[in-house]
């Protein structure tokens, strides 16, 4: 499998995990002037000669058997079209044109072909997920050989499938060209994330949402990273619903803007309680907290107990800041004051001692 961080060494498994596009049929890229109008004047005439020009005699001998029309056959539109297709589908020609020469006995049929350029190497542009070294090894173009458009097309599909398999659903080969030196240039667009834009958040600040994204701006869109990012935003506990929309990029139509739509709910709580016992008398409890303080994502809580015969005033105040740097380091503190009454009993169940335990202090958490 391809490693996105180390560059990987094997793109040949791109058809794994359902990526069947790596093995679909690839059409050869060539042009032809053949049409029914140009062939009709020769339909029915006897083919007295059959040749392929633009290649060596040895190559012609290898190619002639793939032609369906033979010497002695009558010219037909379908037959000429089929032979143009057969030659074009070899992948070695950029142009295939039938040429008729009238002779007393009938016509001589020649297929004039233009051979693709000889490649000297391959160059990749726009790739950041896979290294050029890995892609070059996968393409496996041997210098000095004629470019085969079918072979190249299959390799291009393999590259596209590898991107899709690894979650880069917007990445694909965008263009191919051969320069005057015979170098095959492969241009790849990877679907860069131009921006991450929160929407629907009336209280929560934008940065509280975007800092949870493991999918980063300026990096190729990856559906697995976006999925994890949405889960992290939802797990903040501030929202009833979190959805993602993909919008076209402003700088480049191949890029994408991620809009994350949220539906907020209340994050503050207030608890009031009261109780009575003979030992303690009437006690009251007040507790209030906020899990998204002023939309910053900070959390605070105040717990206060009042009343009782001893007029206890137990309280605890805590505050947590989940992000103090870009790495998600948290810092929290709590301050508490507590007094509890304890009673000891003997084996007969009689009270033998009564004492109070007081505690006061603070805690600091970091990490």
Model-derived features: where do they sit?
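Acidic, glycine-rich low-complexity/disordered segments
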Residues: 18-53, 118-123, 142, 160, ...
